[in-house]
Amino acid sequence: MMTAHRKSNGDTTNFARRHIGPSARDVAAMLETVGAKSVDALMAETLPASIRQAAPLDLGKPLSETEAIAHMGELAAQNQVFTSLIGQGYSGTILPAVIQRNILENPAWYTAYTPYQPEISQGRLEALFNFQTMICDLTGLDVANASLLDEATAAAEAMALAERHSRVEAKAFFVDKDVHPQTLAVMRTRAEPLGWNLIVGDPLTDLDKADVLGALLQYPGSSGALRDLRPAIAALKAKGALAIVAADLLALTLLASPGELGADIAIGSAQRFGVPMGYGGPHAAYMAVRDALKRSLPGRIVGLSVDSRGMPAYRLALQTREQHIRREKATSNICTAQVLLAVIAAMYAVYHGPEGLSQIARQVHRRAAVLAAGLRKLGFAPHSDSFFDTLSVDAGAKRAEIVARAAAEKINLGVGETALRIALDETTTPATVEAVWRAFGGQLAYAELDATTREALPEALKRTTAFLTHPVFHAHRSETEMLRYMRKLSDRDLALDRAMIPLGSCTMKLNATTEMMPLTWPEFGSLHPFAPREQAKGYHALFARLEKWLCDITGYDAISLQPNSGAQGEYAGLLAIRGYHAARGEAHRKICLIPSSAHGTNPASAAMVGMDVVVVACEKNGDVDVNDLRAKADKHANDLAAIMITYPSTHGVFEEHIREICDIVHGHGGQVYLDGANLNAQVGLSRPGDYGADVSHLNLHKTFCIPHGGGGPGMGPIGVKAHLAPFLPGHPATRGDAPVGPVSAAPFGSASILTISYIYILMMGGEGLKRATEIAILNANYIAARLDAHFPVLYKNARGRVAHECIVDPRALKTTSGVTVDDIAKRLIDYGFHAPTMSFPVPGTLMIEPTESESKAELDRFCDAMIAIRKEIGEVEAGRFKIEASPLRHAPHTVHDIADDAWARAYSRAEGCFPDGVSRTDKYWSPVGRVDNVYGDRNLVCSCPPVSDYAEAAE
C-alpha cells in the first residue's frame, strides 16, 4: 500500500518527510536486510494480530510547517498577556537574550539526555554543578540536588524525607497556613495514601502543642508576610522534628538564609531566575539539606570526581539511592527532573553575579515598599509591615471594583478568600505601581513617595553572609564572555545535534525547530497559571484538541495533562486506581503486581500510593510468566489493586498474550496500568485502551517530541478509561472538589511545552504518526539484523522480530576477553556515539532504540562502530593484548592522551583515537577520560568551593 510518506518524498511541505530519517530507497534496502517483503509485512510479523488497530488514525489534515506556525499565531492571539501580580510562587522575570538564544533555543542543550554517560556530559554537568552551588550558597545548607519538578512536588518530597529521618514517632506533619495553596494541596495528595496527618496552623503560635515529625514554613509567606522563623525552628528541634523552609531565592539575596535560621531542609522554585511563567511551567524546583541528610536527598545530584588521568570530572553521584536501583525502597520515584530550566537559572546567576542579583532584589523590594506607602495613604494598610515583594490588603466592599479597575489596566491581582494580594517582580516598573494605585482609587506619583519611603526588611532578618563567591559567578559580566562560556560548555557535550543517541526506553527522536518556536513567544510564556481563564483561551483550545488527539491515539476516554514527568504520571495513574477502588468500598485492595523486568519507577510509584509490591516472574524469552501471574492473582484476589506492565515489554518485544494478562487481572478485581514509555511502537498501529488497559501515562518527551533537555523537562499526562475519569488529579484552581488531589503545582503541569507535542501531531497527522511508528520498528529490526551475528540479540518474538528497540548481549565476551559493557559504552564515545542503555532491563547488556528520525546512513555508522568494537574484542580474545592494555579499557581517548609526549600503549595513537570509520576532521573528543565513580562517592563534592578555600590552599 502506498503511504503518505512514500508519496511525499518530493513534497517539501510535508513535515513527515522531514521528521522521518530513511528515504524510500533506504526503506527498500533495509527491508531486504531484515528479510521482509514490505513494511506492512514487517508490522504483521512484529505485532500480534489481536491488538492491531482496525480503523486508521484520523486526526485531520496535517499542516505544513508554515501553516502550523500561522495556526499557532492564531492560538497565541487568543491569549491575553496581562501584568500578573498574583504571586503564589510565580513571578514575571527577564530572561537575558544571550541565555534564551544560546541555551533555551539551542539544540546542543535541549536535545541532550540525562548525563548517565558523564564523559560526554561535562558541559551540562558543570552547569548543574553551578546550580547546586547557587542553591547551597543562597540557602546556607550543605548539599543541593540538580532540580525537582516544581515547588509543590519538592515540598511533598521534603515531607517524605522528614518522615524517614525524624525522631518523632507521630505520623503528623505541620504546614504553615501561609504556604502557597497549591503546595498544601499537593502535600495532602502525597500524605493521604501513606496515612500521614497534616496539621495547618501558625508556626509561631501553634507548634508548641503539635506532636509532629516536621514542619514546612514559607519564607516569606504566600501573603507576603516576613516573619522571623527561628523560634518555630527551635521548637521543632526541641521535639526532634525536622524544619523545612520553602524560600524565595531572590529574597534570599537580601534575607538571612534558611540554614542560618536553623532549617534542616530548604525547598522552592528557581522560576524567577529567568524562566518564563509559561502558564505553569516548566520550572526547576530545588531542594537543599544539611550534610547528614544527603543520602536521602531525592533526584539527581552532580558530584565532582576525577578521570583516568586524575583530572577533575563531573558525574551523577550517590545513584544507589535512586529508583532505578532501589525500586520500591528508593527515596523517591523521581526520574526526569528539570535540567534545562535549572541550567537557565544557573546561567542567570552566572550572568548577573551576586551584585546583580542583589540589585534586582533591592529594586523589587523598593517598589513594593513604595507601593505599600501609597496604599497606606489611600487607606489600605498592608497586613504586614515586614515584607519582601508581596503585599496583602483588605479591600472590603470595594474588592470587586478594585479587581475590575486593575483588569482595565491589564493587571491581575491575587484574589484570596478575604484579601487582595499584590506581588511585584523584576518586570515591575514605577508605571505599574501607579496603575495599581489607580485601581485602588488613587492618583499618586511614584517619584514623590519614593523619596520618603523606607525599606520593610527587619534588621534581624537581613543577610550578612556572602554568597556566590566562586569565580564562575564573577567572570562573565559581558555578553561576549557569557556567550563563550556557554559555547565552551556545550562543546563538551554530545547531544542529538551531533549524533544519534540510541538509548533504549528513551526515544531520542527529532525535536523539530518548528515545534520549538512558539515556546518562547510571550503569548505562551508570559501567562501566570492562575490568571483568569478568559485570558488563556488559546491555551485552553490547545488543551482540548490535544486531549482529544491523545484519546484518539490511545483508545482512552479522558486525559489529564497535569503530571510533569513519566514518574509523576505513574503516581497519578495509581492514585486514580486507588480512588476508584475506594469509591467502590474496596480500599483494602493494595497489592500491585509488577513484572521483574519493570522500570524502577514502577515499584517506587506503587510504594508512594501505599500499595504493596508483589513481583511477577518473567520467562526466559522476557515475557511475563502467565502461570506465575495467574497464581499470584489467585493468591491476592481479595486485595489485588493493579498490575503495572510495560508494552511493548522492556525486553523490546510485543508479548503475544497481553490481552490474556489484562483479562486475568480484571478477573481478579484489579486494574491494568500500562506504562506508556514504549508508546512510540504503537501509535497508529494499536491502542492500549482497546486491548484491556485501564490507564497509562504518555511520555510526551519521548513519543511526542518534547526534548529531554539533558534530564528534563518532561511531561507524563495520563489517559484513562471512563470509569477512572472521575479520579483524575484535581487542583484548587480548577477542580478543587475532585476526589483525588493535584500531583503538580499547576493545573495543566508544564503547559508551555505542550505546544511542542501539539505542533508535532498537527504537522504529522494520523498517517504520518503511523508511518513514524512503522519506521521506528523497521530501524530497530535493521539494527538487530546487522548486529545479531556480532552481539546476539537477546529477545525476539516467535517470528524473529523486535519492536522499536532491541537488547544485544555481550555477556559471554566477558568470559572470553574480560570486556565489560562499560568498556563497550566508553569505546563508543571514541566513535562519536552516546552509548545505548546499559544493564537495563538485563544486567550486562545494551538496549538500543534508534527511533524513526535516524537515517540509514546514521544507523549504518552506528552498526559499523559496534562491529568494529567486536573486532577489537576479538583481538583481545586472540591475545594481541590483555583487556587492561586494550583501547577498550582505556576509552574514551582524549586530546590529552593523543598529545602525550610518550605513548607507552600496546596500540597506536591512531587505533586509540581514530578507530575505523572515524573522521579526523570533525571527530568529537571526550573532554575527560573515564570517570572514577567510586572516588566520586567516597569523596563527595557537590558544589563549587568558596573563594576562601582557594586562598587557604595558596597559603
Swiss-Prot record:
It catalyses: N(6)-[(R)-lipoyl]-L-lysyl-[glycine-cleavage complex H protein] + glycine + H(+) = N(6)-[(R)-S(8)-aminomethyldihydrolipoyl]-L-lysyl-[glycine-cleavage complex H protein] + CO2. The modification N6-(pyridoxal phosphate)lysine is found at residue 702. Keywords: Oxidoreductase, Pyridoxal phosphate. Its cofactor is pyridoxal 5'-phosphate. Its EC number is 1.4.4.2. One of its GO terms (biological process) is glycine decarboxylation via glycine cleavage system. SUPFAM superfamilies: PLP-dependent transferases. GO terms for molecular function: glycine binding; glycine dehydrogenase (decarboxylating) activity; pyridoxal phosphate binding. Pfam families: GcvP2_C (PF21478), GDC-P (PF02347). It comes from the Bacteria. One of its GO terms (cellular component) is cytosol. HAMAP family: GcvP (MF_00711). NCBIfam families: gcvP, PRK00451.1, PRK04366.1. The glycine cleavage system catalyzes the degradation of glycine. The P protein binds the alpha-amino group of glycine through its pyridoxal phosphate cofactor; CO(2) is released and the remaining methylamine moiety is then transferred to the lipoamide cofactor of the H protein. PANTHER family: GLYCINE DEHYDROGENASE (DECARBOXYLATING), MITOCHONDRIAL (PTHR11773:SF1), GLYCINE DEHYDROGENASE, DECARBOXYLATING (PTHR11773). Belongs to the GcvP family. The glycine cleavage system is composed of four proteins: P, T, L and H. This is Glycine dehydrogenase (decarboxylating). It comes from Bradyrhizobium diazoefficiens (strain JCM 10833 / BCRC 13528 / IAM 13628 / NBRC 14792 / USDA 110).
